A protein has these predicted regions:
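Transmembrane alpha-helical segments of polytopic membrane transport and secretion proteins
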Residues: 1-28, 262, 266-284
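Periplasmic/extracellular loop-to-transmembrane helix junction in inner-membrane transport proteins
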Residues: 7-23, 42-84, 245, 252-263
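Interhelical loop and adjacent transmembrane-helix boundary motif
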Residues: 59-62, 66, 218-274
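Hydrophobic alpha-helical transmembrane segments of multipass integral membrane proteins
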Residues: 73, 77-85, 89, 93, ...
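Transmembrane-helix boundary motif in ABC transporter permease subunits
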Residues: 82-114, 127, 284
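Amphipathic cytosolic juxtamembrane alpha-helices at the membrane-cytosol interface
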Residues: 102-106, 174-202, 282
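Generic hydrophobic transmembrane alpha-helix motif, especially the helices
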Residues: 115-151
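Transmembrane alpha-helices
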Residues: 162, 184-222
Length: 284
């Protein structure tokens, strides 16, 4: 009797399972298709304008050249500086919260602050970075100002991903290492962190992706210069100089055309209708 009831239930569930599987596959195919469509569209539209000279030269009005080499170097520079600061702090904070700190008000406050930082708009980070790092610390528009600001933005991402990665490590690893006489730090360094490394790397990659795509915060902190350093020593001096990333250059390229168009339209209306808004004899 029980076997017949089970078979009847299985048969009645089959249609629902079938439609569920179909819906899941359709959603997955649509997601991949949209991503591939965006990549193909950008590639087809942009491949004509990209060449070796465009990638290896800088934009110069005097020389009449257009390129993004300086912006590529600036982007890599900001990524390296930001990750050198944010990764140790984020991983260290996650290790403390997960392995050392006892559940209580302090841990709750730190986790609440982390979640709050993750939800703040990037423009707010940019304004804070401009006022605190740029003006109060006198770093002005520079790579350091932009990197310090981006560190605050990506810290929650690295911390939360590292925490989740550490939680996936079985407790038997911890108890086994302690039982064999290993110290806690030795156990964390040789067992927990290597076991959680895939999750930590995922957090780092997500943080790098956010840095590469960020423009609002860097517009207020790093500036928009796309110049290349002339020497290896100049590379270190450039840390205190303005530096425009690829997203900043993209933003400026799009907005400058709009500004020129709006300015031209305003001049035409001014000469045609006059300052008082009345018809004028002046020609556009």
């Amino acid at each position: 009797m029980t076997g017949s009831n089970t078979s009847i239930r299985t048969k009645t569930r089959h249609p629902a399972d079938f439609f569920t599987y179909v819906a899941i596959y359709v959603c997955a195919i649509l997601s991949v298709a949209l991503l591939l469509g965006i990549i193909v569209y950008v590639f087809v539209k942009g491949i004509r304008s990209v060449n070796w000279e465009f990638l290896t030269s800088v934009t110069s009005v005097l020389k009449g050249t257009t390129g993004i080499a300086g912006n590529i170097v600036n982007t890599l520079y900001i990524i390296i500086v930001t990750m050198l600061i944010a990764t140790p702090i984020g991983v260290g904070a996650a290790v403390y919260l997960n392995e050392y700190a006892k559940p209580g008000k302090l841990v709750s406050m730190i986790e609440f602050a982390t979640e709050t930082l993750a939800g703040i708009p990037s423009i707010i980070f940019g304004l804070f970075g401009m006022m605190f790092f740029g003006q109060t610390l006198h770093l002005k528009y520079s790579i350091l100002t932009g990197s310090f600001t981006l560190t605050l933005m990506v810290l929650p991402l690295i911390t939360r991903n590292t925490q989740e990665a550490l939680k996936t490590v079985p407790d038997s690893y911890r108890s086994g290492a302690i039982g064999l006489g290993a110290g806690k730090w030795h156990m964390i360094r040789t067992i927990l962190l290597p076991s959680a490394m895939p999750g930590i790397i995922t957090g780092v990659i997500l943080a790098i992706g956010r840095i590469v795509g960020e423009s609002a915060a860097l517009l207020f902190t790093a500036g928009s210069s796309g110049l290349l350093p002339k020497s290896f020593a100049d590379l270190f001096a450039k840390a205190k100089m303005p530096a425009g990333t690829l997203t900043i250059q993209l933003y400026l390229s799009a907005t400058c055309r709009t500004v020129r168009r709006v300015t031209f339209t305003g001049k035409v209306k001014y000469y045609r209708y006059g300052a008082e808004g009345k018809p004028s004899l002046k020609r556009a």
